[in-house]
Amino acid sequence: MNRADARRARPAPEGRPMSGPGPLPVRLDPPVDPARDHVLGEPGADLTLVEYGSYACPHCHVAHEVVAELRDRLGDRLRYVFRQRPIRAEAARPAAELAEAAGLDGERFWHAHDLLMRRGPSFAAGELDAIARELGLPPRERGAGPWEGAAARVREDVESARRSGVHLTPTFFINGRRYEGPWDAAALSEALLGSLGHRLHAATLDFARWAPSTGLLLVVATAIAVAIANSSAGAAFTAAWQAPLGLSLGGRGFALPLVQWVNDGLLTLFFLVVGLEIKRELTVGRLASWRAAALPMAAAIGGMVAPAALYLLVIPAGPLAGGWGTTISTDTAFAVAILVLLGDRVPVDLRVFLTAAVIVDDLVAIAVVALFYSGAISLPWLLAAAAVTALLAGLNRAAISAAPPYVALGALLWACLHAAGLHPTLAGVILAVVTPTRPPPDLRALTGQAQAVLEAELRRAREGVLRHGPSEPALRALDAIHDRIESPASKLLRTLDPWASYAVLPVFALANAGVAWVPGALDGRGRLVAAIVLGLVAGKPLGMFLAARLAVRAGLAVKPAAYAWRQLAGAGALAGIGFTMSLFIAGQAFPDPADFRAAKIAIFAASLLAGVLGALVLWPRRSPAAEAEALPAPEGSEVDAAGT
């Protein structure tokens, strides 16, 4: 159901613009070793600043001045470590090797470092040789003096930069953790000294980047809801969620139970996030090409048809027959959390497969809610909703990207859909469709514009004109550049995704997962429980596996060699963790509280069984022979002069 975990859990392959680069490592690898690293300052200082830089990088020369200011501010409390990460410039690697050679030949690294920082970032022909002679180094000949060892040290630093996720220079690590703030001395000093705000920000980022974090929050929220529901406060807890909440004006009002505000209101934000992700996948993501999408699409369709068919086989008719929708969806937060906890037992390609399949799941689940779980349709309000949708589409066509008109019309659309008898969460999906997108920006042009603006402000600062920071025209220009870098749809997704993952879904679990176990809770509802459990635990993996095999046999899809059919079946078993979306559809399908209670128990049991089954199937590692067959032969390559 939620793919934020999936994005954190997998690296993005080339040509995959959906998620940008894969998640970068947060920790320095390897840690600082005073016996190997170049350390400036007290070896036992309590603050450590590590910089990956290049002598041919102009930004590193600016950072050099900032580091000097930090050392003046913090004194003996700070130790500074410089590691080489040569950029793509002709003199970058020779300059790095020169500094390392000076360190090996008489421990003069910092002398060479300062010389190179003063004279760079551009070095004239023969200038590096002149610096080497000034330092008393022997001629640069292969195997002569310290040069061979220096080249090896640069390669080691480049490999360290790769493992630490360094993709630009300079990159800083503070006390072993990646620093992602501004490069000015004040911000770096605040981070080094560990202000409360910085520590809270760092802890929040660490938790959000941990792939199982959303699943963990859902588990905690569910456990709290179940515990309270089965305690002496259970009745009050249930009554609180049923309390009406709304607005009234002049004798007129609009009110809904609190739980309905959660299910119809808050979940609209979630459906907006889902819609934005589906839109991006269909345009530039994993479902943009038939070859990439064929296998997960086939598996997803089989994984929805088979569970629904098994459910209807057990309950073919009657008031409970409408509950088949509870068996067709997957809670990605839990499924991906288990995949991540299994570590390298699960190939990255398998995570990609499951995530793409769930995107199709979500798309169909949205259609199912709209078509099968809406109330009686009011034609006037339906026409009003269509008119609002047309206005939203007009905003898109007019290239209006400001948020307020979309927010206002989105709220109006929600009200029209609610009054029309359709599920109002569809407003989120419609908003996702009409939110503007645009082609990727010309980063070269925008970089030049930003540099021109900032250089003009820098000149004004030197002339003493600026007293209170950049001028208002400069700030407006920088705001316009920033807005152009990211499309409105991407920006909206990036903004709302954490709220959907860490606020909306846990609140939904609190409001809906609290099931009180009472004697006779399942009396007369054994077939309902069996239908849901059978659909999720057996139907999901069976349908996904058979549909995928059929698609491959028919030549419609190709299975990656990185994972075996057994592992695909294990992913199918994990797809049986319905939970949040299953609970949501169950709330629409079973108006009788007793039926809903039994359905919740069945969904809990099925999700638990599916998770255990999937983990057991995926636990065995592939044999070495199978791994050798599955993976392409490694290509020998050396680190190039850019350190990549």
Curated annotation (Swiss-Prot):
<feature type="transmembrane region" description="Helical">
    <location>
        <begin position="254"/>
        <end position="274"/>
    </location>
</feature>
<comment type="similarity">
    <text>In the C-terminal section; belongs to the NhaA Na(+)/H(+) (TC 2.A.33) antiporter family.</text>
</comment>
<keyword id="KW-0915">Sodium</keyword>
<dbReference type="InterPro" id="IPR012336">
    <property type="entry name" value="Thioredoxin-like_fold"/>
</dbReference>
<dbReference type="InterPro" id="IPR036249">
    <property type="entry name" value="Thioredoxin-like_sf"/>
</dbReference>
<keyword id="KW-0406">Ion transport</keyword>
<feature type="transmembrane region" description="Helical">
    <location>
        <begin position="528"/>
        <end position="548"/>
    </location>
</feature>
<keyword id="KW-1003">Cell membrane</keyword>
<comment type="function">
    <text>Na(+)/H(+) antiporter that extrudes sodium in exchange for external protons.</text>
</comment>
<dbReference type="InterPro" id="IPR013766">
    <property type="entry name" value="Thioredoxin_domain"/>
</dbReference>
<feature type="transmembrane region" description="Helical">
    <location>
        <begin position="502"/>
        <end position="522"/>
    </location>
</feature>
<feature type="transmembrane region" description="Helical">
    <location>
        <begin position="217"/>
        <end position="237"/>
    </location>
</feature>
<dbReference type="GO" id="GO:0015385">
    <property type="term" value="F:sodium:proton antiporter activity"/>
</dbReference>
<feature type="transmembrane region" description="Helical">
    <location>
        <begin position="599"/>
        <end position="619"/>
    </location>
</feature>
<keyword id="KW-0813">Transport</keyword>
<feature type="transmembrane region" description="Helical">
    <location>
        <begin position="414"/>
        <end position="434"/>
    </location>
</feature>
<feature type="transmembrane region" description="Helical">
    <location>
        <begin position="295"/>
        <end position="315"/>
    </location>
</feature>
<feature type="domain" description="Thioredoxin">
    <location>
        <begin position="6"/>
        <end position="198"/>
    </location>
</feature>
<feature type="compositionally biased region" description="Basic and acidic residues">
    <location>
        <begin position="1"/>
        <end position="13"/>
    </location>
</feature>
<feature type="transmembrane region" description="Helical">
    <location>
        <begin position="390"/>
        <end position="410"/>
    </location>
</feature>
<feature type="region of interest" description="Na(+)/H(+) antiporter NhaA">
    <location>
        <begin position="199"/>
        <end position="644"/>
    </location>
</feature>
<dbReference type="GO" id="GO:0006885">
    <property type="term" value="P:regulation of pH"/>
</dbReference>
<feature type="transmembrane region" description="Helical">
    <location>
        <begin position="322"/>
        <end position="342"/>
    </location>
</feature>
<feature type="transmembrane region" description="Helical">
    <location>
        <begin position="570"/>
        <end position="590"/>
    </location>
</feature>
<dbReference type="Pfam" id="PF06965">
    <property type="entry name" value="Na_H_antiport_1"/>
</dbReference>
<dbReference type="InterPro" id="IPR004670">
    <property type="entry name" value="NhaA"/>
</dbReference>
<feature type="region of interest" description="Disordered">
    <location>
        <begin position="1"/>
        <end position="36"/>
    </location>
</feature>
<keyword id="KW-0812">Transmembrane</keyword>
<dbReference type="GO" id="GO:0005886">
    <property type="term" value="C:plasma membrane"/>
</dbReference>
<dbReference type="InterPro" id="IPR023171">
    <property type="entry name" value="Na/H_antiporter_dom_sf"/>
</dbReference>
<keyword id="KW-0472">Membrane</keyword>
<feature type="transmembrane region" description="Helical">
    <location>
        <begin position="363"/>
        <end position="383"/>
    </location>
</feature>
<keyword id="KW-0050">Antiport</keyword>
<dbReference type="Pfam" id="PF13462">
    <property type="entry name" value="Thioredoxin_4"/>
</dbReference>
<keyword id="KW-1133">Transmembrane helix</keyword>
<keyword id="KW-0997">Cell inner membrane</keyword>
<protein>
    <recommendedName>
        <fullName>Na(+)/H(+) antiporter NhaA</fullName>
    </recommendedName>
</protein>
<keyword id="KW-0739">Sodium transport</keyword>
